[in-house]
Amino acid sequence: MSINNYLTNLQNELYVNGTEREKIRKSIDTISSRMNMYFGIGKNCEHRIVKKEIFGSYSRDTMLSRRYDEKSDVDYMIVFENANQYNPQTCLNWLKGFAEYWYSTSIVKQSLPTIVIELENIKFELVPAYETLWGTKYIALDTSSWQYTNPKELNDKMLDVNNNTSYVFKRMVRIIKYWNIKKNYRKYISYELETFLTDKFQYSYSNCKSSLDYLDWAFYFLGQYKYIDQYVHQG
């Protein structure tokens, strides 16, 4: 088997598809409908949800199959009305109440700044948020403060690069993420790794003709990581 054939097979293995993707989709739909019910009755009506949004690697289509990354999760942003009038911990408590009510047989825990629900097929991280009148979003930074976020920015940039590289880029990103897990001991934060590679490949891919070329170029860029401290996981 040639190296390029091996890489093609690995890319297919890492991708979340088929039954696994369908189970995740059903879990998302179930959580969404249960939230509508939970926050639509009794005292919980006070905490009205105005928007729910999947973000993170699942929305970018760069999440690895759980067969290759046991820590794969789906990030779910929950935008509450007037959440800016509360500290993030209060909103996290609302989400924890929901999770414990509907998922009493699953592992539910707070892992700042999210509430984690560990289902059999996938882990969800519920992230409280609020949105301004101008559409600017803020998510929990810690228990007492909010931080600006714009998931669409990276999603759009990554989509452009992927289209410009004939859909090779995202497949390459998944391989690099797998390498970071298995050989690099998760040294690099997944989100920052994807951001770094997207920025680098925006204008530097014209000489890449095969999957191996893209990987070779990616590892060349990764050699610069030691000079870019914000991309290195300190924990």
Question: Where do the protein language model's features map onto the residues?
Answer:
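Glycine-rich, often proline-containing surface loops adjacent to acidic residues and nearby aromatics
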Residues: 71-79, 151-157
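N-terminal regions immediately upstream of nucleotidyltransferase
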Residues: 1-71, 84-87
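Conserved catalytic core of two-metal-ion nucleotidyltransferases
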Residues: 35, 39-42, 47, 91-139
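Beta-hairpin (beta-strand-turn-beta-strand) motif
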Residues: 57, 81-83, 129-131
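Extracytoplasmic/secreted envelope proteins and their assembly/folding machinery
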Residues: 25-28, 32, 92, 96, ...
